[in-house]
């Protein structure tokens, strides 16, 4: 029996057999988003296939991004000028990157590997590092998510 998650009118059945990647492709998705064509994008901690794309039925379509990410953390797909764009957040790179749906880099916000100065040692990636913050600093310091306002601003 498939487990049910959620509550109230937002309940879902978990289908652990939904995704059908090629044999040997390990999909350890840390974040998921869906484009306007109902394609499902999994931001994945597999360094050879960090962005894995499935159709709505779980059939593998493609992957891209090999070698571009260190610690994938968040994905959002938004419309810009009538086109889907893919925003990705890499926690350890300290960046937000915008791509076309087929993986062409359009924009990078932040400096790769440049953590803001908050008093935390730059090599401390522990989950308790936030306890060592002594002062505020500019963007970014271990970013973990992306949000957009109704007007489209990030």
Where are the language model's segments positioned?
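Eukaryotic scaffold repeat domains enriched in small/polar residues
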Residues: 1-154
